[in-house]
Amino acid sequence: MVNYSSISCIFFVALFSIFTIVSISSAASSHGEVEDEREFNYKKNDEKGPERWGELKPEWEMCGKGEMQSPIDLMNERVNIVSHLGRLNRDYNPSNATLKNRGHDIMLKFEDGAGTIKINGFEYELQQLHWHSPSEHTINGRRFALELHMVHEGRNRRMAVVTVLYKIGRADTFIRSLEKELEGIAEMEEAEKNVGMIDPTKIKIGSRKYYRYTGSLTTPPCTQNVTWSVVRKVRTVTRKQVKLLRVAVHDDANSNARPVQPTNKRIVHLYRPIV
């Protein structure tokens, strides 16, 4: 005789296990930046624009309610100059990487271990990098042509982002090394392309000074408690390079920069080493 109670018990245990796995997977994916950015946009006063991000999904509510949101305006008169934070010690190495069109930006995702950066004694592994144009962060109210985000994640799943700002001028050598691949994506229907081994140490920072504050991801779900390190020196990029990063996205938009968010009495440090 078939024991239906045993079968029912096994069925419900299996169903519960599947539900638990899906829930954990969903929670993990909601922590970091979304992989597909087509569910929101950067159009002002649009139903999917920055002012409405927090209303689009329950898990995106921090975009509208968070008190530690990014980007912010880095005003010299408000920063606390310190020397104890230490240099940005990047311990990167070449890694296999993929260029991916996420809908509103181009992301360079590292498939293998690309190395780490140490902040406040904790190591954060480099996961990916992407660009925003114009810049999201401003310095004394000034917005720049381009902003690079190098996104890291620690073992505690907290995020750390190292940011480089660019003004129009000479070509950036790292972007120049990717120009052929970016042009290829611009002509492809596919959303991603493997670009082989990429060395993140080739990204030039050129300054030991940087701003440090606690903020959030600048795209949904706008997760907070992100450690931001914004390099003080503004580097250069050509108009052609900025345009190439936008054309490759295929979204016909002129901008993918979130508006500046209220600082809300947060402390912003400017690390300046003692000579």
UniProtKB/Swiss-Prot annotation:
Its cofactor is Zn(2+). Residues 1-27 form the signal peptide. It catalyses: hydrogencarbonate + H(+) = CO2 + H2O. The active site is at H104. It is found in: Plastid, Chloroplast stroma. Glycans are attached at N3, N96, N225. Keywords: Chloroplast, Disulfide bond, Glycoprotein, Lyase, Metal-binding, Plastid, Signal, Zinc. One of its GO terms (cellular component) is chloroplast stroma. N-glycosylated. Belongs to the alpha-class carbonic anhydrase family. This is Alpha carbonic anhydrase 7. The gene is ACA7.
